[in-house]
């Protein structure tokens, strides 16, 4: 039996520049950190029969991998040429549709478990790259590369994506004092809406390819602010994060319909009136979590 634990991620800067439509022209930059919230996968080879069993929010029992409804599990098993006698069960601290990288956590965790089951060692970089191949190339999801790399590497991670899609991974040097301040001052709030990012990311990618000025300018700003946020965190002067998040949110809303709505705007305005210095929505937007930076009045903001 193999058990894997893969972390969810929160993006601090550069979100959206990891999409092929952008980085293939301008290069991408991401600064994210892994949370202490996880996706757990349990993989086992039963000896009693040859069935393929899958447990997630649903349960599946099939004779052929091709009959699986869960597309990520199906693609992973096919890629590793595992065709029978396998049990896969998953549990997570955070539900799907959170904007925190849940699908990639599942992909990375499952690939890690399956390779381990086959006694195959993969570097973290190759594991992330293989997960990208599954989600982006095979399943044709309109998504970027950060979720897979953050799930594989964890920590405070910087991704620099070249125009040819190669990813340079470095770990940001964050002091213990700054880490404690971030833990204290960054607050996540669930919007109550599970998002489906395909439509939003698809629109963003099309607008980038069509060279729509508003979207390109927003992504350029978001990438530049990512570098500045990295410098802020490394310097320890994290009060500036609130202002940076607030500016980021203004640009983010311009990139696609559905990123925000009147209810989300009310949530954001209420947070700003009750102690938050700035905030941003997780992932592509349209649901999931808001991340707010707040130094004082946290109890008031939570209420």
Regions found by a protein language model. Name each.
Residues 98-101, 256:
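Short helix-coil transition sites and intra-membrane helix breaks within transmembrane domains
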Residues 1-13, 18-24, 32, 36-82, ...:
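C-terminal nucleotide
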Residues 79-98, 130:
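Glycine- and acidic-rich phosphate- and metal-coordinating loops
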Residues 31, 94, 100, 159:
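Short clusters of hydrophobic/aromatic residues that line enzyme substrate/ligand-binding pockets
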Residues 287:
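Glycine-rich active-site/cofactor-binding loop and its immediate structural neighborhood
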Residues 100-124, 152:
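DPxDG-like acidic metal-binding loop motif
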């Amino acid at each position: 039996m193999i058990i894997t634990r893969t972390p969810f991620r929160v993006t601090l800067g550069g979100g959206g520049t990891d999409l092929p439509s952008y980085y293939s022209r301008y290069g991408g930059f991401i600064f994210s950190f892994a949370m202490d919230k996880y996706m757990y996968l349990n993989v086992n080879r039963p000896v009693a029969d040859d069935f393929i069993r899958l447990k997630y929010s649903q349960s599946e029992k099939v004779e052929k991998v091709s009959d699986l409804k869960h597309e990520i599990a199906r693609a992973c098993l096919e890629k590793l040429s595992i065709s029978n006698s396998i049990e896969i069960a998953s549990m997570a601290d955070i539900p799907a549709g959170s904007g925190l990288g849940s699908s990639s956590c599942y992909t990375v965790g499952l690939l890690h478990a399956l390779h381990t089951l086959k006694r195959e060692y993969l570097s973290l970089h190759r594991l992330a790259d293989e997960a990208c191949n599954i989600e982006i190339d095979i399943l044709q999801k309109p998504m970027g590369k950060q979720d897979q790399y953050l799930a594989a590497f964890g920590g405070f991670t910087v991704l620099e994506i070249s125009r040819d899609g190669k990813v340079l991974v470095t770990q940001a040097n964050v002091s213990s004092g700054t880490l404690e301040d971030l833990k204290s001052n960054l607050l996540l709030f669930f919007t109550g809406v599970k998002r489906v990012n395909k439509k939003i990311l698809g629109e963003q990618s099309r607008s980038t390819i069509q060279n729509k000025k508003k979207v390109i300018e927003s992504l350029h700003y978001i990438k530049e602010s990512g570098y500045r946020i990295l410098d802020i965190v490394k310097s320890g002067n994290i009060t500036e994060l609130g202002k940076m998040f607030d500016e980021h949110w203004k640009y983010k809303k311009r990139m696609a319909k559905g990123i925000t709505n009147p209810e989300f705007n009310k949530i954001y305005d209420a947070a700003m009136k009750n102690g938050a210095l700035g905030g941003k929505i997780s992932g592509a937007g349209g649901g999931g979590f808001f991340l707010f930076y707040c130094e004082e009045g946290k109890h008031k903001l939570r209420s």
